[in-house]
């Protein structure tokens, strides 16, 4: 997608700022993404010093229509994150790392789509659930939680007899 590319010719020495609006169609390019609906603003601040660019990428917004891990009801999750990357323009064919992105002089733009996607995905909460109320309790759909508990098969924990003897060992 061209809308997440920054033309190198547009970047002047000093600070340059670019704004990107991230919505649902952004995630269509990434087939293995659980995220399909979002309202996020990504800000790319590029500080150019000759052949070197310092990129500060910031995202702020919310991801919609995620499923709560507890009650499976749709929820929205706020997301805010920032990352810093160095972009070096070079003649050599070098492999980029997490901290440094190498761009050949023959290229005329920087595509930030993958970097924005990774920043969003890596900053999703590990456990996606409804927010806590004032008493610190989860505000999940109680009817759904009760149904899940009703139909959940409880399994007894069985131990492996080969390891049972180790339970009696006294370690000093």
Task: Describe these PLM feature segments.
Residues 1-68:
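A positional/architectural concept
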Residues 1-10, 89-172:
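Charge-rich, low-complexity linker and terminal segments
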Residues 68-71, 140:
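Short cysteine clusters
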Residues 75:
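Cys/His-rich microdomains that often coordinate metals
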Residues 78-81:
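Short Cys/His-rich "knuckle" micro-motifs
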Residues 84-88:
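Short beta-strand edge segments in extracellular beta-sheet folds
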